[in-house]
Regions:
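Sequence/structural signature of beta-propeller domains
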Residues: 1-309
Length: 309
């Protein structure tokens, strides 16, 4: 079992909207660049950036237009549900890389993501572009049924998406997209099309208690493997929240086959992961969704023992 150590909570300099809480609660995607970490939340229109060291409150960068209501039920119905954050390295228009915020696709209003170019120091530049996933997700829904995309990572020439199969009819799946085609579409400002899909494979990750574990995020390793998080949430569908029975961390082989899975020592809803190899070991940063807007999401760290770096 992996031992989680809390590094900080995701407090903000100011709330996203007047009357809101000055923190990120529903943390759902995580990427480290330079001396900062970037987080998307599934109930937010912004990217949050935090210093890697210390507890200095984070800052916000708008990703999508509009405003979300404070009322939890109304907010849930209108939110863009940004569930994954992916670091891209080979965009001609972003020489220092870019962040791709990926929506879940679980409802018709959850089809728009965002592309954020990075500066040399890894900070977002503010030159944000909207990315339309509608046509791509329509194709994936025809193959998988209800969508709930929660992980994205660039692995070699493929952009790998992880579909969360929580609920009665959802399917956990590894979806490989043609990375070159995706990057060209992003560079041209075009919507992502069905022709970027290469393979779609379903997987069963097992259970925590009597509840099925389902993918919640992904992070690449240098050799093409991908670290993923998974959570067992007792819910009937991809829209509703439920009791969290446990979370786990795993590894996908370069071909997308699950090759390692281990639980964590706290009953938290892990939703975001960043992985890097340091001193011959795989070090992880992780965020959890508090599922309570009054509670700040935690940032954890751990070392992935038992897996060669």
């Amino acid at each position: 079992m992996l031992r989680l150590t809390q590094r900080r909570t995701l407090t903000l300099q100011a709330p996203e909207i007047p009357g809101g809480e000055p923190h990120v609660s529903a943390a759902s995607g995580l990427v480290r660049t330079g001396h900062q970490v970037h987080v998307v939340a599934d109930d937010s229109l912004h990217l949050a950036t935090f210093a890697l060291e210390g507890n200095t409150p984070g800052t916000l960068l708008r990703l999508l237009p509009g405003e979300l209501p404070l009322d939890a039920k109304a907010r849930k119905a209108l939110k863009p549900d940004l569930e994954a954050l992916c670091l891209l390295r080979d965009l001609p228009g972003a020489p220092h890389g870019a962040l791709l915020a990926v929506p879940s696709g679980s409802t018709a209003v959850r089809m728009k993501g965002a592309l954020v170019p990075l500066a040399e120091d890894g900070r977002p530049t503010g030159q944000v572009r909207e990315v339309d996933f509608t046509d791509l997700y329509a194709q994936l829904a025809r193959e998988l049924g209800p969508l709930n995309v929660e992980g994205a990572a660039l692995a070699g020439t493929r952009l790998r998406l992880l579909n969360r199969g929580n609920g009665d009819v959802g399917a956990d799946a590894v979806v490989d997209l043609d990375g070159g085609r995706v990057l060209r579409a992003l560079e041209a400002g075009e919507a992502l099309q069905p022709d970027v899909v290469r393979t779609v494979r379903r997987w069963d990750l097992g259970k925590a208690g009597n509840v099925r574990l389902s993918f919640t995020d992904a992070a690449p390793l240098p050799d093409g493997r991908i670290v993923f998080t998974a959570t067992a949430e007792d819910t009937r569908d991809s829209y509703s929240d439920g009791a969290v029975m446990g979370s786990a961390v795993g590894v996908l082989a370069p071909d997308g086959t699950p090759m390692f899975l281990d639980g964590v020592d706290q009953k938290v809803k892990l939703e975001g992961v960043d992985a890097r190899v340091e001193r011959g070991r795989i070090h992880l940063l992780l965020v959890a969704d508090a599922d309570d807007p009054a509670v700040a999401a935690p940032l954890f760290e751990t070392v992935l023992e038992g897996v060669p770096a």
